A protein has these predicted regions:
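Positively charged, small/polar-rich N-terminal and surface patches that mediate targeting and assembly
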Residues: 1-94
Length: 94
Protein backbone atom coordinates (compact mmCIF):
# COMPACT_ATOMS: atom_id res chain seq x y z
CA UNK A 1 0.00 0.00 0.00
CA UNK A 2 1.07 3.56 -0.67
CA UNK A 3 0.30 6.87 0.97
CA UNK A 4 -1.15 9.63 -1.21
CA UNK A 5 -2.17 13.21 -0.57
CA UNK A 6 -4.72 15.03 -2.69
CA UNK A 7 -4.78 18.84 -2.56
CA UNK A 8 -8.28 20.20 -3.14
CA UNK A 9 -8.46 23.98 -3.47
CA UNK A 10 -11.74 25.71 -2.71
CA UNK A 11 -11.66 28.87 -4.85
CA UNK A 12 -14.04 28.73 -7.80
CA UNK A 13 -12.89 30.39 -11.05
CA UNK A 14 -16.20 32.26 -11.47
CA UNK A 15 -15.92 33.59 -7.91
CA UNK A 16 -16.84 32.29 -4.51
CA UNK A 17 -15.58 29.19 -2.78
CA UNK A 18 -16.63 25.61 -2.14
CA UNK A 19 -19.07 25.91 0.76
CA UNK A 20 -18.98 23.72 3.85
CA UNK A 21 -22.17 22.00 2.70
CA UNK A 22 -20.73 21.36 -0.77
CA UNK A 23 -17.60 19.89 0.83
CA UNK A 24 -19.61 17.64 3.17
CA UNK A 25 -21.65 16.42 0.20
CA UNK A 26 -18.45 15.67 -1.73
CA UNK A 27 -17.04 13.77 1.27
CA UNK A 28 -19.84 11.25 0.79
CA UNK A 29 -18.22 10.31 -2.54
CA UNK A 30 -14.94 9.67 -0.74
CA UNK A 31 -16.72 7.65 1.96
CA UNK A 32 -18.24 5.45 -0.74
CA UNK A 33 -14.75 4.49 -2.00
CA UNK A 34 -12.38 4.58 0.98
CA UNK A 35 -13.06 3.20 4.45
CA UNK A 36 -10.34 5.29 6.03
CA UNK A 37 -8.66 8.61 5.28
CA UNK A 38 -7.65 11.90 6.89
CA UNK A 39 -8.67 15.40 5.84
CA UNK A 40 -6.75 18.48 6.94
CA UNK A 41 -7.61 22.11 6.28
CA UNK A 42 -4.73 24.25 5.05
CA UNK A 43 -3.98 27.63 3.51
CA UNK A 44 -2.73 27.17 -0.02
CA UNK A 45 -1.78 29.25 -3.02
CA UNK A 46 -2.40 28.55 -6.70
CA UNK A 47 -0.88 30.86 -9.30
CA UNK A 48 -0.31 33.52 -6.64
CA UNK A 49 -3.87 33.44 -5.28
CA UNK A 50 -4.38 32.32 -1.68
CA UNK A 51 -7.13 29.83 -0.97
CA UNK A 52 -8.45 27.45 1.64
CA UNK A 53 -7.37 23.94 0.72
CA UNK A 54 -8.39 20.50 1.89
CA UNK A 55 -5.62 17.90 2.02
CA UNK A 56 -6.95 14.36 1.71
CA UNK A 57 -4.51 11.66 2.86
CA UNK A 58 -5.25 8.07 1.87
CA UNK A 59 -3.30 4.84 2.27
CA UNK A 60 -4.35 2.60 -0.60
CA UNK A 61 -3.43 0.45 -3.56
CA UNK A 62 -6.36 1.93 -5.49
CA UNK A 63 -4.71 4.89 -7.25
CA UNK A 64 -7.25 4.73 -10.08
CA UNK A 65 -10.10 5.34 -7.63
CA UNK A 66 -8.17 8.23 -6.08
CA UNK A 67 -7.61 9.77 -9.52
CA UNK A 68 -11.34 9.40 -10.25
CA UNK A 69 -12.17 11.28 -7.03
CA UNK A 70 -9.72 14.06 -7.98
CA UNK A 71 -11.22 14.26 -11.48
CA UNK A 72 -14.75 14.42 -10.03
CA UNK A 73 -13.74 17.26 -7.69
CA UNK A 74 -12.11 19.10 -10.58
CA UNK A 75 -15.25 18.77 -12.70
CA UNK A 76 -17.84 19.50 -9.99
CA UNK A 77 -16.07 22.62 -8.69
CA UNK A 78 -14.56 23.73 -12.03
CA UNK A 79 -10.97 23.56 -10.76
CA UNK A 80 -7.96 24.15 -13.02
CA UNK A 81 -6.21 21.16 -11.51
CA UNK A 82 -6.01 18.90 -8.47
CA UNK A 83 -2.61 17.79 -7.15
CA UNK A 84 -2.04 14.16 -6.14
CA UNK A 85 1.29 13.32 -4.60
CA UNK A 86 2.70 9.98 -3.53
CA UNK A 87 4.54 10.21 -0.24
CA UNK A 88 7.80 8.32 0.26
CA UNK A 89 6.62 6.65 3.46
CA UNK A 90 5.67 3.11 4.31
CA UNK A 91 2.61 2.91 6.54
CA UNK A 92 2.69 0.62 9.55
CA UNK A 93 -0.58 -0.24 11.23
CA UNK A 94 -0.10 -1.44 14.82
Amino acid sequence: MKTYQVFLGTNKPAGGTVSTQEWLTFLKQIDAVFTGYTVETASGSWQGIKEKTYILTVITDEIKQLIRIAEDYKMIFNQDSVLIQELPVKPLFV
